[in-house]
């Protein structure tokens, strides 16, 4: 779809959506997004130019269907997939991708760390994906030197980052905000550093006693990104891994640096979103969102959860969806899903489904609470179908039609019950919607009550 759009841009020094927007040019991607979001193309261009909205769209990801992440657009959901040294199969990861897209993932991150050829699994995922693909390049940087921190050089990081860009990765988590002077602030935490990328860079800085190379070479990374229109997802290496550690000095020190880096990327006209926690008590979620907006000049916020309890292994998709709905309501632009396997193991296909649906609910609830135009239309349509006992329409409008039909059919599987004016909960005699009290009857009752001087 995008080949004809991209062709005139080839060979230019800066092909980012932000660069075009700041020069007053509405790209085909901006037009496409405007139609999807039911917003004016001019508004999309203005928000991209301002940095409040991003369109992750690498020029080498030709089968991408562009989408937007930002306060002006719908709240989005990311799904994580990826092979590990203990569980790895390229075909399985491609199937997870397809399942994630089927159940509404707006973007997908390939977090593969080993067990397969990382370039091959990434390429297979990009070739099959109509949604933006994100990666964490430091994983492959470490894998490229067989896990040996002492052999890992600054140039190794940049080489892998450019390789991901060349393959068509739309956004990369770059852990550039973690500085060597932040590390002592981790003392006193219960769970320390829980970011894999952050952990790698912390080890590198401690071993070499040098500043974070992703920070010192940040302008070089910007030069790479603007050649491909790859978007920064600035990683929060010091995100809290438990409620005790939330909103501490370490987290907020890194956030301040992420704000600095956001503005440095914008100087290169490179798109940015900023990653956030993590594990956060409900009463601190609004503070975290507001603080990010303040420090990072309203760049789109992308949060993992946050989980609002630490005692829900096996059900962390529920604990985190509560926090995600609140974060979305307060202005977070994208929610990274959490599956039931969080903290326990690598998710399988069913875990991907469970996590995604939980987060589609959270994002949708946030859009309704923020009064986005048309956000509640589908809910109202389903409610009409429910009142009219149109079971097939209810299934069709559900976030997970297969699951809705499955649960209904467990007790009333015959086709005749698709027209029945009851379900197995109340049965045919006790459903309150079965009585269908007419508006005319209610008007007559109101008139009679008024005649009796009864307040209504």
Curated annotation (Swiss-Prot):
Cofactor binding note: Binds 1 [4Fe-4S] cluster per subunit. The cluster is coordinated with 3 cysteines and an exchangeable S-adenosyl-L-methionine.
Enzyme Commission (EC) number: 4.1.99.17
Regions crossing the membrane: none
Signal peptide: none
Gene Ontology cellular component terms for the protein in this record: cytosol
Keyword match 4Fe-4S: yes
Record field: catalytic activity: 5-amino-1-(5-phospho-beta-D-ribosyl)imidazole + S-adenosyl-L-methionine = 4-amino-2-methyl-5-(phosphooxymethyl)pyrimidine + CO + 5'-deoxyadenosine + formate + L-methionine + 3 H(+)
Cofactor field: [4Fe-4S] cluster
Single Gene Ontology MF annotation: carbon-carbon lyase activity
Keyword vocabulary terms for this entry: 4Fe-4S, Iron, Iron-sulfur, Lyase, Metal-binding, S-adenosyl-L-methionine, Thiamine biosynthesis, Zinc
Residues noted as binding substrate in the record, renumbered to the chain: 80, 109, 139, 175, 195-197, 236-239, 275, 302
Annotated residues for binding of [4Fe-4S] cluster: 423, 426, 431
GO biological process: thiamine biosynthetic process; thiamine diphosphate biosynthetic process
Top-level taxonomic group: Bacteria
Binding locations of Zn(2+): 279, 343
Pathway: Cofactor biosynthesis; thiamine diphosphate biosynthesis
Family the entry assigns: Belongs to the ThiC family.
Task performed by this protein: Catalyzes the synthesis of the hydroxymethylpyrimidine phosphate (HMP-P) moiety of thiamine from aminoimidazole ribotide (AIR) in a radical S-adenosyl-L-methionine (SAM)-dependent reaction.
NCBIfam families documented for this protein: PRK09284.1, PRK13352.1, thiC
Protein name: Phosphomethylpyrimidine synthase
Native organism: Prochlorococcus marinus (strain AS9601)
């Amino acid at each position: 779809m995008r080949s004809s759009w991209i062709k005139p841009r080839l060979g230019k020094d800066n092909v980012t959506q932000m660069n075009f927007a700041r020069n007053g040019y509405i790209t085909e991607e901006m037009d496409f997004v405007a139609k999807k979001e039911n917003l004016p193309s001019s508004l999309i261009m203005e928000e991209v130019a301002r940095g409040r909205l991003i369109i992750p769209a690498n020029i080498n990801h030709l089968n991408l269907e562009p989408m937007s992440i930002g306060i002006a657009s719908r709240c989005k959901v990311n799904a994580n997939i990826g092979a590990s040294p203990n569980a790895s199969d390229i075909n399985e990861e491609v199937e997870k991708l397809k399942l994630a897209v089927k159940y509404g993932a707006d973007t997908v991150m390939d977090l593969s760390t080993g067990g397969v050829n990382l370039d091959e699994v990434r390429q297979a995922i990009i070739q099959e994906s109509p949604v933006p693909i994100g990666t964490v390049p430091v994983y492959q940087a470490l894998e490229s030197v067989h896990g040996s921190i002492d052999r890992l050089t600054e140039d190794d990081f940049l080489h892998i980052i450019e390789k991901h860009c060349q393959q068509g990765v739309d956004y990369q988590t770059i852990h550039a905000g973690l500085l060597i002077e932040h590390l002592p602030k981790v003392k006193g935490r219960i769970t320390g550093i829980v970011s894999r990328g952050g952990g790698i860079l912390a080890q590198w800085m401690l071993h070499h006693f040098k500043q974070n190379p992703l920070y010192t070479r940040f302008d070089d990374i910007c030069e790479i990104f603007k050649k491909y229109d790859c978007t920064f997802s600035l990683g929060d290496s010091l995100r809290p891994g438990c409620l005790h550690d939330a909103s501490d000095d370490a987290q907020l020190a890194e956030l301040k640096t992420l704000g600095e880096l956001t503005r440095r990327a914008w100087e290169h006209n490179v798109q940015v979103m900023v990653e956030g926690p993590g594990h956060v008590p409900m009463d601190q979620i609004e503070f975290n969102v507001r603080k990010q907006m303040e420090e990072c000049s309203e760049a789109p916020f992308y949060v993992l959860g946050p989980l609002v309890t630490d005692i829900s292994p096996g059900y962390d998709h529920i604990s985190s969806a509560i926090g995600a709905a609140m974060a979305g309501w307060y202005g977070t632009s994208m929610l990274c899903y959490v599956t039931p396997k969080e903290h326990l193991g690598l998710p399988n296909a069913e875990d991907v489904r469970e996590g995604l649906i939980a987060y589609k609910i959270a994002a949708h609830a946030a859009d309704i609470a923020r009064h986005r135009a048309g956000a509640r239309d589908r809910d109202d349509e389903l409610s009409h179908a429910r009142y009219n006992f149109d079971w097939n329409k209810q299934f069709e409008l559900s976030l997970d039609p297969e699951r809705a039909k499955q649960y209904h059919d467990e007790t009333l599987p015959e086709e005749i019950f698709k027209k029945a004016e009851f379900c197995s909960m109340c049965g045919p005699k006790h459903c309150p919607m079965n009585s269908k009290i007419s508006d005319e009857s209610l008007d007559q009752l109101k008139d009679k009550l008024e005649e009796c001087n009864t307040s209504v």
